[in-house]
Amino acid sequence: KKDGEYKTGGVWTMDKMGFKYGKLEVCAKFTSFQGGWAAIWLMPQERQYPSVNNSYPGEIDIMEQVSMDKIAQHSVHTHYTLDLGYDKNPPRNGYGEYRDGEFNIYGIEWTAEKIIFTVNGEETFSYPNLHLPNESLMQQWPFDVPYYLILNYSVGGEDAWPGPIDDRGLPAHMEVEYIRYYEKENKGNDDDGDEEIPEDLIKNGGFEDTFAEGKQPGVFMSGDIEWDK
């Protein structure tokens, strides 16, 4: 808090690196206090249904923790779940326990059929693709395009989800030990594997094991990533 205003922030990979399918893990710990809001989430680089104007083009909340809750919340937000109100068939959110004040691993395993959410390697929630015949209208599964990763720590307020802010909990922070991303060796496409890898990628930084070219975990951009104000 500075000059009577709350300052929050985060980082993202928008226009730097997108994720589509595979396994994504973030090892992080964060401060929990009344009014705090830690989040690890994904938004689409581009809409899967660009011709349709709706409020929710797709969102995958790998982890959200608010105030003094001792659970990590997982959610998906789509036109189907929010605009149309189908939030229980199938359920759009779930919960997992985490170790407060310690590093925990929050992840997803994402395929064309479902998204499985995990905490410390344990499955805590999953969301399936229903393959609706009118999918382009219902938009239950806008998850077949690349998404970018967002890590941020916000605070609430009287009308916000975390509720009133207790200034005694400040300053608050999120600390990230690593981000790891894995892809299946055979993704079922015609990619010949000759795609040029940008020079500003960190490949397998700090890991002792040797991985096949292009298959290293934790491949992410090394350039500065600024949170949009």
Residue ranges and their predicted role:
Residues 1-193:
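GH16 jelly-roll
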Residues 193-229:
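Extracellular and organelle-lumenal recognition/adhesion modules and their flexible linkers in secreted
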